[in-house]
């Protein structure tokens, strides 16, 4: 809290007055970061796109976000602080991973309903897609075993995941 107050140019009392506790500060930080990915996956931006283009857009935004230094730092904080603040982990999961999965599953459900892709379980298909995107990349980045991926590296990984996904769940 001292560092945050110093960087913000305010007193520690001001930080506590605004957030109430370290847990609330972490929760606000997590919520702000999670909103960024949710906004980038806004459903209206996906409608009207061919399925391959929509999945590519989702994949690039998701992987870029997930592997960004800010997201990695927040993830590390959440993992390290959740034993002391269990609600932080729950709030992080609800605002981030669960929300993102829900948005993607709803997109896939609508696309399947319009006959644009063949699948019968949008939630399971979403898990498959995200699993192909994440693979070992996230853990390796969190552990510092791999440098940041370039835009070209992200694009190649996403294109491969989309190709594999559309083999499992073809478009007509």
Residue ranges and their predicted role:
Residues 22, 29, 33, 55-58, ...:
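Hydrophobic/aromatic residues within well-ordered alpha-helical segments
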């Amino acid at each position: 809290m001292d560092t945050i107050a110093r960087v913000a140019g305010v007193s520690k009392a001001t930080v506590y007055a605004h957030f109430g506790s370290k847990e609330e500060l972490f929760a606000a930080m997590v919520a702000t970061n999670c909103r960024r990915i949710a906004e980038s996956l806004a459903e209206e931006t996906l409608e009207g796109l061919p399925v391959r283009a929509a999945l590519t857009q989702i994949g690039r935004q998701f992987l870029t976000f997930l592997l960004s230094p800010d997201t990695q730092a927040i993830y590390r904080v959440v993992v390290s602080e959740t034993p002391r603040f269990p609600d932080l982990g729950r709030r992080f999961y609800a605002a981030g991973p669960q929300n993102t999965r829900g948005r993607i599953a709803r997109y896939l459900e609508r696309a399947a309903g319009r006959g644009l892709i063949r699948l019968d379980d949008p939630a399971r298909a979403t898990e498959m897609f995200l699993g192909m995107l994440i693979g070992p990349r996230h853990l390796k980045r969190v552990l510092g075993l791999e440098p940041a991926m370039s835009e070209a590296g992200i694009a190649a990984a996403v294109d491969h995941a989309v190709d594999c996904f559309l083999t499992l769940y073809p478009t007509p």
